[in-house]
Amino acid sequence: FTFAVENAYLPFNYIDAETGEALGWDYDVFNHMGELMNFTPVYVPTAWDGMIQATADGQFMIAGDGITITSERDEIVDFSNGYINLAQKVLVAADNLMVMSIDDLKSGDYTVAVQKGTTNYEFAVGELGEDKVKAFDTFDFAIAAVISGDADASIIDETAGLGYMGANKDKVKLVGGDLTSEQLGLAF
């Protein structure tokens, strides 16, 4: 059984910086599936931007990675039942006092860092326009841009935002209300 993981989406799948161990909810679930069904999972680190199509093409049996269930994606892959409902939120540097909501991002001269190919990217472009959006290959890079000041904010799933807050203590925070409500599932 091959499982596609990105290893860059806290808390779903990531590499522990101190131990080098692959951790997260996806690993816990896939390992448990292996125990129940008597197989050893084979994890294949995969770039996000090709993961869903590669799963549709049969390169992987299942893809994890906090995949939002959308009608467009459902046309090429099947999904499990949703395993979590979450909201998209605005994430900013902890010392940022200027951006407190999506409205601030809309009205000001701000740059928003997001991962390309995600519903967060689609939302940011739809609400703010492409000129305000910087697309990155992973959310790790997008969050690093916020922390370094190369971007003013990110649009991120709340659960992942909390994961990045835990991993970057006192460096980032979530602000404002819920932007959307989404359901995540496993793709196969």
Which role fits each region the language model picked out?
Residues 7, 17, 24-28, 36-38, ...:
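Extracytoplasmic
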Residues 8-11, 48-51, 67-72, 95-98, ...:
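Solvent-exposed loop/turn segments at secondary-structure junctions
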Residues 2-4, 91, 111-114, 154, ...:
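Short, well-ordered beta-strand segments
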Residues 13-17, 30-38, 102, 119-137, ...:
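Ligand-binding cleft/hinge of the Venus flytrap
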Residues 93-110:
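Flexible hinge/capping segments at coil-to-helix
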Residues 1-66:
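Extracytoplasmic small-molecule ligand-binding "clamshell" domains
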Residues 7, 84-92, 158-188:
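Periplasmic-binding protein-like
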Residues 32-36, 44-45, 49-62, 76-78, ...:
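Short helices/loops that flank or line small-molecule/ion binding pockets
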